[in-house]
A protein has these predicted regions:
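Secretory pathway targeting signatures of secreted, lumenal, and periplasmic proteins
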Residues: 35-82, 114, 120, 177-235, ...
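Short, well-ordered beta-strand elements
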Residues: 67-70, 134-143, 211-214, 286-295
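Signature of long, low-cysteine stretches enriched in small and polar/charged residues
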Residues: 33, 86-131, 230-282
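Short, solvent-exposed coil/turn segments at beta-strand boundaries
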Residues: 47-50, 62-64, 106, 129-136, ...
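Boundary at the C-terminal end of the N-terminal hydrophobic targeting segment
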Residues: 28-31
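Bacterial N-terminal signal peptides
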Residues: 12-24
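Bacterial N-terminal signal peptides that target proteins for export
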Residues: 2-15
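Surface-exposed amphipathic alpha-helical segments
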Residues: 41, 45-49, 87, 138-188, ...
């Protein structure tokens, strides 16, 4: 899961970096359209793909392949313009090609990207579509060696439809829920993450306001030492610089072992002093991560609000 860099429109950019893939023009897929839980998107999954347990989309574990669907507030044309060769290269990805196509009767950008992860070369296909208010991103990933999946995944991505009357419930398909407070409202959802903000919006409002994001890991992941993992995870945030005066404590929420961290830092983009809040909860091979950011001069009040939200965390179903 990626955590937003600021209180404004940086959330979509962070998710773009995390969810890059490609697609190209192809015939329709073979399965019947399936609504992706937690989204307003439907597509025809390839044979052998099933609804994912930890993210919004479909997966085929035996092939290490997935299709991830994400909806973002913000204009699609702006998002498409940012998908440059240089931006991809800065994230360790190689742009193979890109093209403009029409999907669901609308113009969309298709990118083909390759990336090496854990010694394996993957191909990522990404569709970036939508309108002036919302962006739809559909990412297909598969090992380069599994070439038999190339066409089926491409077909599935290009079969996507969206923008109908179907409105997903905030917690639909999630492994958990967490409740808002009068101060921190539920602004929305991005994939398997809930976004809380003071304004109740993900892309608008006062940049001085606080934001909290909570989600779960998108794949199975064993954690032997919760504190060690939490401290390491906090230092990997790209939203702030070096952490200072780190204060941590072990705690239990909904019966799960966890570790909470509060630290001083400076915003990576503006240099402004902020407070970072983080909570990690572990359930077997799934972990839940909450990260919040607030200007330092408002930390005393808002840190309590972060804790009120995370204190309502409750599992809705067991991950498989």
């Amino acid at each position: 899961m990626k955590i937003p860099a600021s209180r404004r429109a940086r959330l979509p950019l962070v998710l773009v970096i995390a969810l890059l893939a490609w697609a190209s023009m192809a015939p329709a897929a073979h399965a019947a359209p399936v609504q992706v839980l937690g989204t307003g998107v439907a597509l025809e999954p390839p044979p052998g793909f099933v609804p994912a347990q930890r993210f919004t989309g479909f997966e085929r574990d035996v092939k290490s392949a997935s299709i991830v669907v994400t909806e973002l507030e913000g204009p699609a044309p702006k998002m498409q313009k940012g998908m440059t060769r240089e931006m991809l290269a800065s994230r360790g990805m190689t742009l193979i090609r890109s093209q403009t196509v029409r999907v669901h009767g609308k113009s969309a950008l298709l990118l083909q990207v390759s990336q090496v992860a854990a010694g394996t070369e993957f191909l990522k296909w990404m569709l970036v579509a939508g309108d002036t208010k919302k962006t739809v991103m559909i990412v297909g990933t598969f090992p380069k060696a599994a070439n038999d999946l190339a066409l089926p995944i491409k077909q599935a991505i290009l079969s996507a439809t969206w923008g109908g009357k179907v409105q997903a419930a905030p917690y639909e398909g999630l492994l958990f829920r967490a409740d808002p407070t009068p101060v921190l409202k539920l602004a929305g959802r991005v994939g398997n993450a809930l976004i809380f903000s003071e304004s109740g919006s993900m892309t608008h409002g006062d940049p001085n306001q606080a934001i909290l994001v909570m989600g779960n890991s998108s794949s199975a992941f064993s954690i032997a030492n919760v504190e060690q993992f939490a401290r390491d995870r906090a230092t990997r945030s790209t939203q702030v610089g070096e952490l200072r005066n780190i204060v941590g404590r072990a705690l239990t929420v909904d019966g799960l072992p966890g570790y909470e961290i509060v630290a001083e830092a400076n915003d990576a983009r503006t240099g402004r002093e902020v407070r970072m809040y983080q909570l990690v909860l572990v359930e077997q091979k799934t972990y839940y991560l909450a990260q919040g950011f607030v200007p330092a001069d408002r930390a005393r009040v808002i840190l309590d609000q972060f804790r009120q939200v995370t204190g309502t965390f409750k599992r809705l179903r067991a991950p498989k």
